[in-house]
Amino acid sequence: TTPGNVIDLEDIAGRMLAILGQYKVRRADIDPWNSVHVESSFKKAGIPLNKFAQNITHLSVPTQELERLILGAEMNHGNDPVLTWMVSNCEVYRDSNDNIRIVKNLANRRNKIDGIAASVNAVFGWIQTINKPGGVPYIFLPGAKLITA
């Protein structure tokens, strides 16, 4: 939450930059929709941005890659209860071309999947950085424990 009666996007951007300051961030991958405040703050801080739309053609490969990392025991979330809850709120949507993306399950649309969506976004950025799926990322979830085979 932010102080006041409305969401303070500059406050949120400032908090994000404070967290990112604890890590060696080379680039931030963001959804361009409604990102003006974040984009401005990150540019001022000198953090390069890679914008990509949250559509199935962009999200299919990183969703498949995150699934591969989890099922292959190459990545886990350290039994984080919030991420466990968010995973339980996810379903996989598949289009007629076999592209996939995560969606909220229909049982309760109010439940959150933001942490899982952020993980897919991070995998997208990681794949862009190494230019191919496969392997094991150094880290893409704060506090996550990565297991290498």
Each model region followed by its residue ranges:
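RNase H-like, metal-dependent nuclease domains and their acidic two-metal-ion catalytic environment used
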Residues: 1-54, 64, 77-149
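Active-site proximal helix-loop segment of RNase H-like, two-metal nucleases, encompassing DDE(D)
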Residues: 65-74
